[in-house]
Design a protein with these regions (language model features):
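Aromatic (often tryptophan-rich) hydrophobic motifs at membrane interfaces
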Residues: 3, 32, 49-51, 55, ...
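Active-site/acyl-donor-binding loops of N-acyltransferases
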Residues: 16, 72-102, 231-279
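Non-catalytic accessory segments adjacent to catalytic cores
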Residues: 44-93
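A conserved beta-strand-loop-helix scaffold within acyl/acetyltransferase catalytic domains
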Residues: 1-24, 71-76, 81-87, 96-214
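The substrate-binding groove and active-site-proximal loops of carbohydrate-active enzymes
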Residues: 35-44
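Short catalytic-loop micro-motif centered on adjacent basic/acidic residues
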Residues: 65-67, 124-125, 236-238
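Cytochrome P450 substrate-recognition site 1
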Residues: 21-33
Length: 279
């Protein structure tokens, strides 16, 4: 916590990751698509403030490196930064731009949507009950595990504490967490779990059953979510980080995501140069 003139103006949610060295980083991995300090309204953390906070931390705990990923701004950081990702948003303004973007997606999935409606009893649920939310969670864990294994990606769901964090979403504030799904014959074939905050819809955990990929169930559900956000006068639909093709097509705004790394010890320089070679 950072105070100025005896007033709390900023909280930095940090932790130290311990491996062969100690790394100061943001809390929330692997679920934090965006990272930044929590700031008092109208207060802006400056570089000198940040340096002072780090100097005070050094007096309390030792660490070899500072490594901040997924920073959505960098005004309080020095020039030891690297643009390493992009986030995309669809802003809902009063012009026709976002309407045209959504309409293009609607036209793209029109054939698959019609085939599903003809061949199956189709249901799209944007307001599930608690029991239905549990079904969505189970579907997400099952299908996400299959997807990560299929693509040889790191499966964070194999780690109990991360899997527990997903399951705990049922217990959090219903106003801020949103569940939705697409069903055929009462069977879920695509789902999404995300967040709503300050009238922004955050598209976080989309997943679909690969056996029904030819019907584009993920895109059909996404289209319904976009239409609903537009109808409900959301400020924006945030696709968060990632350079997937569909995000590049469905946005009217993008933001640079920053990675910051610095070394505090000789051992830390080894880590620093390894990361620099990687990025």
């Amino acid at each position: 916590m950072f105070y100025k003139n005896e007033e709390l103006v900023s909280i930095l949610p940090l932790n130290i990751k311990k491996s062969f060295l100690k790394i100061l980083n943001w809390n929330g991995f692997p679920f934090s698509d965006y990272n930044q300090p929590i700031l008092k309204t109208n207060y802006h953390l400056k570089l000198n403030d940040f340096k002072f906070i780090i100097s005070q931390l050094r007096e309390i705990v030792k660490f070899d490196n500072i490594h901040f990923i997924n920073n959505i701004n960098s005004h309080y950081l020095d020039d030891t930064i690297k643009i390493n990702n992009i986030s995309y948003q669809l802003m809902f303004t009063r012009n026709e731009q976002q309407h045209n973007i959504i309409q293009k997606l609607k036209n793209k999935i029109k054939y698959e949507y019609r085939k599903l409606k003809i061949n199956y009893n189709l249901e799209i649920n944007l307001n599930p009950t608690k029991h239905e939310k549990k079904d969505i969670l189970n579907f997400f864990i099952t299908q996400k595990t299959k997807q990560l294994n299929r693509t040889n990606a790191w499966n964070y769901l194999n780690i109990n504490k991360y899997k527990k964090n997903i399951n705990n979403l049922l217990e959090y504030n219903n106003k801020n967490i949103t569940f939705s799904c697409l069903k055929i014959e009462n069977k879920i074939i695509s789902a999404h779990i995300g967040y709503i905050y300050n009238n922004v819809f955050y598209y976080i955990f989309p997943v679909y059953d690969n056996d029904y990929k030819k019907y584009s169930p993920g895109n059909i559900l996404l289209c319904k979510l976009l239409e609903n956000c537009q109808t409900e006068n959301f400020k924006s639909f945030d696709f968060t980080i990632g350079s997937e093709a569909y995000k590049r097509k469905l946005n009217n705004k993008s933001c640079e995501i920053i990675e910051y790394i610095s070394s505090e010890t000789i051992l830390g320089y080894t880590y620093y140069f390894l990361i620099k070679l990687k990025i």
